[in-house]
Each structure stands twice: as C-alpha cells, then as structure tokens.
Amino acid sequence: ALSDDAINAWRDRINKAPQLKNMYLTKGLVILDESTKRDEWLDHPDTPIPGTTPFEERPLIESDFYVFNANDSYWLSDPKKPTIGYSPLYGPTETPRSIRTRMNIHLLEGLDGFDFRGEDGLFSVQEIKDALMDNSGLTAHLLKDELVDQCQQSPNILINDISIDLSNACSTLRDWDNRYNAESKGAVLFREWITRYNYLSTMYTGDLFAGSFDKENPTTTPLGLARNERNLIALAEAVTLLDDNGIPLDVPLGNLQKAHRAGTTYTVHGGNRYEGIANLQVATTSQSGSSGRSYIDSSIFSGSNERLGDSETLTSSGYNIVHGSSFIMTLNFTEDGPSAEAILSYSQSGSSSSEHFSDQTE
C-alpha cells in the first residue's frame, strides 16, 4: 500500500515525464522515488502480509448482471458502472482498453450485432458457449472494410522498387467473414497484416485507429482506420511473406494453427491478442514477453521453432499454440443444483503414454 502523499507525488511525476506515464499505461509499472520515506510501503495492522493493501481498500466489484475481466484493470469489470478511485497499483482507469476487453463487452452487451443472448436478455449455458466460440475478431470488424476499400483503390504497391499486386489480397479479405474458425479463409492474411504493427496500436489512436479515445465511450473508441500508405505496405509485406513460402493467401486458418504434441498435430481455432477475440489462442512470437515465448522448449513439442521471414508468429510448422483459452468452464445453477461443463485444452497429463495426454486437446 502507498500513502496518499506518495500517490499524489507519483501522479505529479508522470504528468511531467511522459516516459514514466507511458511505462505505467503500457507496462503497469509504478516508478517510485527510493530516496524518500514517503514512497515506502505502508504497514497496516489488519493485513496479514506487511506492506499490502487492506481488503476494504481493494477494488471489489459486485453486479446483478455480470462482472468480467480480460487481463485489464478493474475499471470496466462492470461496464454498466465503471469503477474508479482505487490505488494506481491496481491499474489505470479512464484510458484505452485492450481490443480483447472491448470485444468481451461487445459480446456481453450485445453491441454492434454481437448479440448471443436469448429473448430474456440473459445467457443460457449454450448461448454463452456460442458467444465464446463464435471466434469473431473485433479488429477485423472495425478495420477490414476500410482496408479493403483502400486496397481496391490502390491495388499495386512498390516495395524495394518491386511492384506487388494486391488484387487477390483485396478479394480474400473482402470475402472473409472476420472469424478465426479452422476453416476461415482470410484470417491468416489479416493476421500477417495486423501483427506488423505494434500491439499498442490496437489500443491507441495513431498507426491503426484514426478516431480518438473517449473515456465516456471506452468500448467503441477508438475506431476508424487511419488512412495512410503504411496500411498497404504492411499488406504487401504480408502477401510477399505468404507467397515466398508457398502459402495461399486464402489458406484456411486450421491448416496452420496447431497444437503439436509428441508427433501429432491438432487443429486449434481462435485468435491472438491483436485480433480482439474472446477465444484467445497465443502462438510463439518473434519476441519473448507477455504475448508468448520466442520459442517452445518442451520434450513433447514436435513442431518447429523456425520463424518464417519477418512474421511475428508464423513458423515452418505453422502457428504453434502455447497458451490461451486453456481451462474453460460454464456453470449453471439449476433447480437440481449446479450443472457444469469444462474442458482443459492442453489435456490433463504430460505423459505421452497416458490416455489423458491429448484427449481433451483433440
């Protein structure tokens, strides 16, 4: 826990130093001044661990409707009643949310056509499962049509004095339904396009989004594609990568997105954090960090860590899934008691000789 004086001094500091503010907004880092006792942790007699925050000073969110979280701060865990006023150690508020958080709210609130609720306005077990596994991507929903329009207006782009024809790319994206199902054609091309941007571009106005963030409308802002040449250059780079590796632009996602376990591959549907999807499936990345590992080091992994060109996540064995929607459970309180359904996507056993090594993965 921090004192009010320490928090106020920290707020003054980050308002004067953009680097410190950026570290907080993007990494969750609260940089304190070690030279002053003011910034030392406070001990409270009612906390079992010295220096921690008393329970009554922590965010506690209750709702008659729902609460949720998608690896963001507490601010929009109940989007009907945004919560503020707690220590900055619990994360930023009134700032842009991840595209995945925004998609979850779209699904829960039935926004912009993403309505899976019944006539009663509530979710049955089947309806919530349908919402989770719909596999629609919000970034595609928000940006793809404008990208296709820009592509059709300028179907040729120069890269290193080589003309790249984007006509087939335009058609592939136009015909894609913005989903990340195993059979989805266009998902791979869009992924190779959007992952050429910094992940933070999916949250903030700038390289991807033209519209400004509005804290009064955090679920629907920012929006609108930033129209610039970079969009088509990134698309041409994605086309070149796939062409150079003999991968059709309309390859079904399931042909590439796999879980590799002891010599057997399993097709996995779902999308990554750039794509704004409830069913998160994370592949190894070209850079280690919170988004995944740069390689898989496991005795049961039978894929390849060889990166294809400059792709963020594509290897010679496809998109190697390492984590994401791993334990999924739905629970319904019925007149006969709780009724639950659950799945562990990586299966229960790590022993390849066990019958439970890959049964749930399959």
Please describe what each predicted stretch is.
Residues 157-158, 164:
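Short, mixed-charge amphipathic alpha-helical segments
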Residues 1-141, 149-152, 162, 168-362:
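C-terminal/peripheral segments of proteins
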